Amino acid sequence: MKLLHFTILLQVSLFPASSLAQAGGNNTEVQVQQTLPGTGIAAVNSVNLLRIYSQDTSGGIREARFEGYWSGGLANDTIAKARANSSIAAASDDLELYKSSSSTNFLLKIRVYYLLPNNTLGEAASDSQSRWYTGSLNQYNFQVASHSRLAAVFVPSTQRPRLRIYAQLGDNTIQEFGYDVSPLSQLEPMFANYLKVGRGWQRLANFGPALPGTGIAALTYTTGLRRSTTRVYFQTTDRRVVERVYDNRSWSDGGTVVRTAKPRTPLAATSFLLTPGNPQSVRVYYGTEDNRILEKGTEGGTYWYDGAFEHSAIPDSQVAAVDWGNGGVFNIRLYIQDGAFKNGISEWAWFRRSWRRGILAIPPA
């Protein structure tokens, strides 16, 4: 189920005049102070939809939205309640066209993951643009480390989608959790909840020990008919950022991506295809001791080089990344806390072959 992407004409709308110069003011600053410093940040997109998830000071997971303009991010945009200082991960399936007898609606399937107060995994789910419900993951009481970060992906499939979550256990190993969705479970939630469909959530691969509190990033992409590749990134006890690769058959060691990163570095990753038939390009974002966010890149995974992105962030800032584009045009979006309105989440964009600031701070700013 290949992710749909923006075209260059739609990309331009990400830079309206109001996004490039954002006025402050007491109301804006008060609203932004409700965003937790060092909040987990997660981002998903499809076609012209973008969603950003962060945590407020009361533990709520809030959703900010971009659909040609920014909205959301307020208290009434809370989709779940998490443990304080919870990591946040999100995954989205393709944009789908749903037709009812009375209307036609565009739906984006989204899953958002977080830690509950007892350090078990929680899930908020949406199969439309407005309706959220508690996902089935909450029933499994999967215990993870109190310092665990999270990553999540919808694995592309021509038959049915598969969900994967990556977390750190109490013994500091990195664990994969998975859910293979049956066709029946793709019905509207009101029907799916009454049907026992799919194989349920399961523990899958374990990648061994990692640095306690490491960031975790994951991405996935199609590599051919009914085949996909998943890549997972985390930090080892010697502070290297390493890669694990699943080639639709088994996991392998992808080697070292970053030789030395900030302990418990934030991590984000995204991928894109510059030219059909060429290897997939991958970008990984990580933190340094002096609180900069840097970029590593590879084309096909043969070697890693230093990317162009470099920007300072607040000491505990996390990072999220998405890509909109293909066929020679790619437009990466990064989300970090870089001090805008103190706690605001800022957007940085690779657009027309250079990095530039997108919106100074996403809603509630």
From Swiss-Prot:
Beta-L-fucose 3 binds at R164, E176. One of its GO terms (molecular function) is carbohydrate binding. Beta-L-fucose 1 binds at R51, E63, W132. The keyword Repeat applies. Glycans are attached at N26, N76, N85, N118, N248. InterPro entries: Fungal_lectin. It comes from Arthroderma benhamiae (strain ATCC MYA-4681 / CBS 112371) (Trichophyton mentagrophytes). This is Fucose-specific lectin. Belongs to the fungal fucose-specific lectin family. Keywords: Glycoprotein, Lectin, Repeat, Secreted, Signal. Probable L-fucose-binding lectin. Adopts the six-bladed beta-propeller fold and contains six binding sites per monomer, each located between two adjacent blades. The six binding sites that are non-equivalent, and owing to minor differences in amino-acid composition they exhibit a marked difference in specific ligand recognition. Beta-L-fucose 2 binds at R111, E123, W201.
